[in-house]
């Protein structure tokens, strides 16, 4: 699936990077290569200018490689937390600037098969890299305490303990396998007034365009 990524603050990002045509730059979140392509277009490969663009999502990597073809850019499939490792493997000791556009992309939300959105019923996946444990694995095996901690620490969810309890109770009847199944369980754990007030909040994560 091809990423469509229109950078919202492109000019501001480029101004902030103050690109040197002979410099080395890192884009830690390639996505659809919207930022990466514009950075690479401003680099002069003949003078040593180079972009290293990272993403853990194989769809994003495939798209970025196609859109950066012929430019002084290298695309690596890896999480940006391992940027140092990626740069070292390419023999790069220092960079002139880095860009991180963090969040879930609109492409990932719009692709129901990825399991990030509750707009359509789909397998409960939610993996950025499409490797390792799925969200379904987590909600069907983790303890109430662990699920509550994740919701509280990463989602700042005030009803984390109640939601975790409903998840554990529901999975005793049948495995939780789809996005809408989980959404219904989450909604059932909310007080009626909160459910009405936050009906939109609990139907979709915030997208990164």
Features from the language model and the residues they span:
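S-adenosyl-L-methionine-dependent methyltransferase catalytic core, i.e., the SAM/SAH-binding region
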Residues: 1-204, 208
């Amino acid at each position: 699936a091809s990423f469509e990524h229109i950078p919202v603050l492109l000019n501001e990002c480029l101004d902030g990077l103050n690109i040197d045509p002979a410099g080395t730059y890192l884009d830690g979140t390639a996505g659809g290569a919207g930022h990466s392509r514009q950075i690479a277009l401003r680099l002069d490969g003949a003078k040593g200018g180079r972009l290293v663009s990272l993403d853990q999502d194989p769809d994003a990597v495939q798209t970025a490689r196609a859109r950066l073809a012929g430019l002084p850019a290298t695309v690596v499939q890896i999480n940006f937390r391992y940027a140092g490792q990626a740069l070292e493997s390419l023999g790069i000791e220092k960079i002139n600037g880095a860009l991180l556009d963090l969040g879930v992309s609109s492409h990932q939300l719009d692709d129901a098969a990825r399991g990030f959105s509750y707009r359509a019923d789909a397998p409960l996946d939610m993996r950025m890299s499409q490797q390792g444990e799925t969200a379904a694995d987590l909600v069907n095996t983790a303890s109430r305490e662990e699920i509550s901690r994740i919701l509280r620490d990463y989602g700042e969810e005030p009803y984390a303990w109640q939601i975790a309890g409903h998840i554990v109770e529901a999975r005793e009847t049948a495995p939780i396998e789809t996005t809408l199944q989980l959404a219904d369980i989450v909604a059932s754990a909310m007080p009626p007034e909160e459910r009405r007030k936050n009906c939109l909040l609990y139907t979709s994560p915030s997208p990164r365009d």
